[in-house]
């Protein structure tokens, strides 16, 4: 999905097709020209969209080496139609059974119905999704999380379900956004991310740009994935909130 040559030029805004009325945008920065962060997005025949964002242990070329193999596994399991928790469990067992015993990965996986606004989310040691409301408010979904992928076989990854409102955005990030290793004055953290989300303009591309801008310069892999719903009428239950100022 992302041209490796573009990644070597620094942070890049990647425009993805509008699928099932979702507006999707990402921005990604790979440390030292290469990165261990990656994501995949797949549209199913029923119109649902699945995405997985992963952070491979390490930075730079050493983390980038297994990414191509992991991408293949992710695509296979997402395309198979498994629920997010099952996708993570299958990936975990595949990594444990592989030939890289020191490899572990954090990941968040979700499946979204653009028509109803329902979202199912599962996490493997990764930050859960953040929600930017159409009103401008920002929320963190505090999902239960299983173990990082690749540590032990036979792990379970519980799912959380939520219902989104019209024009709400789901925001996925890696820890390069919340805890950068660059020369930013201080780590953004979850609270800072919520504040920046509340201030950001509502377009998916604008959200990506705002989060990268506030944590630049970055010396750690950093990725933002934003999926924005079309106009409808639904609601979302907040957990932790920040109000747009």
Model-inferred region functions:
Residues 193-196:
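Divalent-cation-assisted or electrostatically stabilized phosphate/pyrophosphate-binding catalytic cores
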Residues 175:
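Conserved catalytic-loop aspartate of Hanks-type protein kinases
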Residues 190:
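PRPP/pyrophosphate-binding module of the type I phosphoribosyltransferase fold
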């Amino acid at each position: 999905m992302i041209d490796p040559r573009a990644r070597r030029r620094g942070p890049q805004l990647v425009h993805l097709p509008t699928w099932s009325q979702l507006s999707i945008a990402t921005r990604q920065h790979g440390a030292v020209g290469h990165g261990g962060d990656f994501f995949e997005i797949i549209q199913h025949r029923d119109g649902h969209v699945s995405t997985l964002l992963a952070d491979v242990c390490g930075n730079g070329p050493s983390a980038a080496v297994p990414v191509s193999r992991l991408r293949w596994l992710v695509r296979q399991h997402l395309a198979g139609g498994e629920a997010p928790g099952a996708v993570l469990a299958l990936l975990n067992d595949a990594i444990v059974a592989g030939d890289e015993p020191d490899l572990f990965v954090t990941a968040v996986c979700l499946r979204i119905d653009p028509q109803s606004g329902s979202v199912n989310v599962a996490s493997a040691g990764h930050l859960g999704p953040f929600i930017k409301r159409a009103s401008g408010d920002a929320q963190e979904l505090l999902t239960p999380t299983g173990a990082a992928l690749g540590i032990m076989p036979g792990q379970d990854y519980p799912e959380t379900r939520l219902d989104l409102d019209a024009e709400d955005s789901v925001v996925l990030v890696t820890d390069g956004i919340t805890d950068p290793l660059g020369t930013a004055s201080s780590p953004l953290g979850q609270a800072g991310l919520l504040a920046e989300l509340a201030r950001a303009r509502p377009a998916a591309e604008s959200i990506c740009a705002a989060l990268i801008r506030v944590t630049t310069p970055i010396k750690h892999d950093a990725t933002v994935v934003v999926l924005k719903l079309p106009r409808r009428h639904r609601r979302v239950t907040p957990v932790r909130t920040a109000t747009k100022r």
